[in-house]
From Swiss-Prot:
It catalyses: (1S,2R)-1-C-(indol-3-yl)glycerol 3-phosphate + L-serine = D-glyceraldehyde 3-phosphate + L-tryptophan + H2O. It comes from Buchnera aphidicola subsp. Diuraphis noxia. Its EC number is 4.2.1.20. The modification N6-(pyridoxal phosphate)lysine is found at K86. Pathway: Amino-acid biosynthesis; L-tryptophan biosynthesis; L-tryptophan from chorismate: step 5/5. GO terms for molecular function: tryptophan synthase activity. This is Tryptophan synthase beta chain.
Length: 397
């Protein structure tokens, strides 16, 4: 019997082997107790402030919007220690693991940002760390692989399947099922079996709390829209959570359109998938006619995932959030544009969200509107990918 509701509407749940149920229930129990413990919160917020560098700024993009009446703000999670929003919830889960007397951490990573954040937390808090990463992602995110190893993490290549995030998730779960008495599985996104989607949201909601305070200070009113990229969905649910009850604020999640929805090479299960069971949860999932999982595709390793967190599936089902897609090319163009116009190198993941904000701006350039884009991470990890693509296509920077 769970202490918290394991579902968001019909989505969520605990679809795992029976051997993992005690571990999930133990995790839920300790999380519920920690949420009531003032010392736990003091430790968490002290780490966020004095180690990770919160609060992160809310930056107005004056050059990108020149000639329009749109104001676009970036929530600068790229400036957080570790280079992305991932550090928020990793610090929370790490001190939760210590509370449970678990001294080994297992994690999966796609873009490598969650892996880096996990390695950072484990180095800081003296925890053993092993990280599963698909071989395809290791090749396209090698700077982050080196960062993880520098901080003492063991990076385990996953050759199964497509060698991407979903395969790393499967291997990490398999490891945890054999070692959960001594280890904690630090899921990197707001997905997976209950209680992970709830835990990750609670540790990421600081993004939305800060954003609301900052936008009210700068504009004295709420924005027209909050826009964030969605793979598993942790950065998006983190910034959405504090605005869900503000019905006048549109919540827009941007999935990876890859090479184009019609090609089938994309990662947009919310709008182009079906309900299914994957990674211990019921959610939207890319499936073929036989119900087999289809491979996802994205220029961005962090969005290359065939499913999505259950809370996003629920928000989509009740029409509280809108989910759209942006292609690889649109994200690539926006990556370069932000660099040249504002001097900020965004992650390719975040470039999807900004690309959609610019689309909306260009649809109504004379309309007064305020958009907040969650710049979920920095793009240092992506510069080699972008360089190789531009070189291959013969384009000059």
């Amino acid at each position: 019997m769970t202490l918290l509701n394991p579902y968001f509407g019909k989505f969520g749940g605990m679809y795992v082997p029976q051997i993992l149920m005690p571990a999930l229930l133990e995790l839920e129990k300790n999380f519920v107790e920690a949420q009531k413990d003032i010392n736990f919160h003091k430790t968490f917020f002290n780490l966020l402030k004095n180690y990770a560098g919160r609060p992160t700024p809310l930056t107005l993009c004056n050059n990108l919007t020149k000639g329009t009446k749109t104001r676009i703000y970036l929530k600068r999670e790229d400036l957080l220690h570790g280079g992305a929003h991932k550090t928020n919830q990793v610090l929370g889960q790490a001190i939760l693991a210590i509370r449970m007397k678990k001294n080994e951490i297992i994690a999966e990573t796609g873009a490598g940002q969650h892996g880096v954040a996990t390695a950072i937390a484990c180095a800081l808090l003296n925890l053993k760390c092993r990280i599963y990463m698909g071989i395809k992602d290791i090749k396209r995110q090698h700077p982050n692989v080196f960062r993880m190893k520098l901080m003492g993490a063991e990076v385990i290549p996953v050759k199964n399947g497509s060698g991407t995030l979903k395969d790393a998730c499967n291997e990490a779960l398999r490891d945890w099922s054999n070692s959960y008495k001594n280890s904690h599985y630090m899921i990197g996104t707001a997905a997976g079996p209950h209680p992970y989607p709830t835990i990750v949201r609670e540790f990421q909601k600081i993004i939305g709390e800060e954003t609301k305070q900052q936008i009210l200070e700068q504009e004295t009113k709420l924005p027209n829209a909050i826009i964030a990229c969605v793979g598993g969905g942790s950065n998006a649910i983190g910034i959405f959570s504090n605005f869900i009850n503000d019905k006048e604020v549109s919540l827009i999640g941007v999935e990876p359109g890859g090479k184009g929805i019609k090609t089938g090479q994309h990662g947009a299960p919310l709008k182009h998938g079906r309900t299914g069971i994957f990674f211990g949860m019921k959610s939207h999932l890319m499936q073929d006619q036989e119900g087999q999982i289809q491979e996802s595709w994205s220029i961005s390793a962090g969005l290359d995932f065939p499913s999505v967190g259950p809370e996003h599936a629920w928000l989509n089902s009740i029409n509280r959030a809108q989910y759209v897609s942006i292609t690889d090319q649109e994200a690539l163009d926006t990556f370069q544009l932000l660099c040249k116009k504002e001097g900020i190198i965004p992650a390719l993941e975040s470039s999807h969200a900004l690309a959609y904000a610019l689309k909306l701006m260009n649809l109504s350039p004379k309309k007064e509107q305020i958009f907040v884009v969650n710049l979920s991470g920095r793009g240092d990890k992506d510069i080699f990918t972008v360089h190789d693509i531009l070189k291959k296509t013969g384009k000059r920077i």
